[in-house]
A protein has these predicted regions:
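Class I (Rossmann-like) S-adenosyl-L-methionine-dependent methyltransferase catalytic domain
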Residues: 1-67, 71-122, 138-219
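A conserved beta-strand element that flanks and buttresses the S-adenosyl-L-methionine
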Residues: 130
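Short catalytic micro-motifs in class I SAM-dependent methyltransferases
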Residues: 133-137
């Protein structure tokens, strides 16, 4: 079972201060120092991404990909290995520094950036955008804005793969990570994307977590 205690403590602390994203840098710093666990830093590509790709490989030749909140870089490295010209960003300077240190010869362009204030040149600039576990780490009140920002990275004809924890609307939100409802996921459609496939399943975590894995396209 993954230890999320410190992540939850920091998230609560920063939410009380009105800073819903400041805790990520603190957690990565503590993780680098061996003082805390970064729950999502598996040091391997996302298994749900790999499973999707094995079943639904996407064209990569001459295509540009973007990884949202890339952390230590494993998913970005995987997309680059599949052939994408890959950009990856995180709000945590420590995470990006660690990614560059782990992959010093990487072709991935790693950047420190804020999802809510991204570089203007990224708007509608990518053929494939990968989002996993970011929105579920944000409070409900800013999720709509986060989803709109993520959708805006997808160029016409491009695709977005989103993998999140899922729940029914009448189920409690619970603790971080906070699962999303189908209604919340539909915000990607309201942001201009078209839902291509929707998968619901339980993953291999202990205990298993309910997941939504959704592929969107900008027509």
């Amino acid at each position: 079972m993954v230890d999320r205690k410190r992540a939850r403590e920091l998230a609560s602390e920063f939410l009380r201060k009105g800073d819903p994203t400041g805790w990520f840098e603190v957690l990565y710093k503590e993780g680098e120092a061996g003082k805390s666990v970064v729950p999502w830093a598996d040091r391997g590509a996302n298994s749900d991404l790999l499973e999707f790709w094995n079943a639904h490989p996407q064209p990569t030749d001459g295509k540009k990909a973007l990884v949202i909140a890339c952390g230590l870089g494993d998913d970005a490295q995987q997309l680059a290995a599949w052939g994408f010209e890959t950009t990856a960003f995180d709000i945590s300077e420590t995470a990006i520094r660690m990614a560059n240190k782990r992959f010093p010869k990487s072709a991935v362009k790693y950047s420190v950036a804020d999802l809510f204030q991204p570089p203007a040149e990224w708007e509608r600039a990518f053929d494939f955008v990968f989002e996993a576990n970011t929105v579920q780490a944000l409070p409900v009140k800013i999720r709509e804005q986060a989803i709109q920002k993520i959708a805006a990275f997808v160029r016409p004809g491009g695709k977005l793969l989103a993998i999140v924890r899922g729940r029914e609307a009448d189920e409690p939100l619970g603790e971080l990570p906070w699962p999303l409802t189908r209604t919340e996921m539909n915000e990607f459609v309201r942001a201009g994307l078209t839902e291509g496939s929707f998968e619901e399943y339980f993953d291999n975590e202990d205990p298993p977590a309910r997941r939504f894995r959704v592929l969107y396209t900008r027509l």
